[in-house]
Amino acid sequence: MKVETNLSINHRRGIITSLKLLSEFLGNKSFNKMTREDILLFLDNLRKSEDSDPMHQWIGTYNHRLIDFLRFFKWLYFHDTESSKRRKPEVVDNIPTLKRKEKSIYKPSDLWTSEEHRIFLQYCGNNKRDRCYHAMAIDSSCRVHELLKIRIKDILYKTTGSYQYAEVLVNGKTGSRVIPLFNSIPYVKDWLDDHPQHANTNAYLFCGLKKNIGRMLTRYAIYDIYQHYKEKVFPRLLQDPNVPSADKEIISILLQKPFNPYIQRHYALSEKAKILKESVLRAHAGWGMNSRMPQVYLHYFGNESSESLLEAYGIITKDQKLTDALKPKRCPNCSEPNKPESKFCAKCRMVLSYDAYAETVEAKKSEVEKLQQKYEQDMNVMREEMKEEMKNQIGQLIGRLKPEIVKEALS
């Protein structure tokens, strides 16, 4: 099948997974002996009730498995026939894919806000790789596998006037394309400082650590990483006394939303759909001219009219609507883009916020006070030592004098 259709590794892995699940469900029954009723029984097992799956996400899984079965069984029964001329064998004949009314599997409330993205980047631990991945995912709008195939050499930094940006070459379903990076630049640089193979420009940008050091991450690994943050890291933050209550409120709402790598592309493309023409958005997203994917992303999740009315009535301004909490903090001294929460420039160490300035002044004041205290302590010790030394010397001189002279001096 690989030779006939040039399937990618991930696609082949997906087909193998579908066949494995089918075989296990039917008690490891031979594929040659499977019937149409067996296939329908497996597919019907994927159905879910309205209560458990109101957005009908199971239909996507149903159709995905069915397409894998169609391809496999056509090859199994007619492998001597040209792939384009193979007919459906009886085992998968007359089993249609299902249609879903929803344009997207996500509800409007499922999408993260820019403030929630900021909170995630701030509290996702000390793993610079994960921060970099998340920032690049929402900055580039790339598919998961496109991001994972990026190598260090694929990122080129550029400067226009006093502004810095980057371009990254990605490989997708429609071929190669160049994507600009803006808000994620500080996170990319931060991760590259700690990258285990940062000197090797051919190394994967998002590689494994510890046992899998240097290896390209899989999309399954990325999914597991996001689940780890949802199930372990962020719930603990709600009990952390050092986390401000305002941040805890945002985290509490965020934990009710999906944590997966795919929803980041939905967020990114929905945001860019507000400012890019459809033809430009297609090129940016890596969609062909006949692709129906824009129907999934271009509906703005039903809130564009609401925002327009809020703006018309003066409740919000256009500037407020486009506010981006993830915009880098540009250094006024060297123009280096820094993370939004940065207090000092990563390049020239210039102070970037009033808090940092106040901390610097306080640190200097504290340093002077410590030096002054040490000076006074040293001087007190020195005075005591000199006083003791003078006392000893006077005692020695008196001891050398004749008693009658001392008696005469004291009389």
Go through each PLM region and give its residues.
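Short, basic (Lys/Arg/His-rich) helix/loop patches that form interaction surfaces
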Residues: 223-283, 287-291, 299, 303, ...
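Basic, Lys/Arg- and aromatic-enriched nucleic-acid-binding interface segment
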Residues: 114-144
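Conserved tyrosine-mediated DNA breakage-rejoining catalytic core shared by Y-recombinases
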Residues: 140, 145, 149-189, 329, ...
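Short Cys/His-rich micro-motifs in 6-15 aa windows
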Residues: 347-362
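Active-site/catalytic core of tyrosine-dependent DNA strand-transfer enzymes
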Residues: 182-255
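N-terminal core-binding DNA-recognition domain of tyrosine recombinases/integrases
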Residues: 1-106
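Catalytic-site neighborhood detector that most strongly recognizes the C-terminal catalytic loop/helix
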Residues: 285-322, 350-354
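DNA breakage-rejoining catalytic core of tyrosine-based enzymes
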Residues: 98-118, 174-186, 199-203
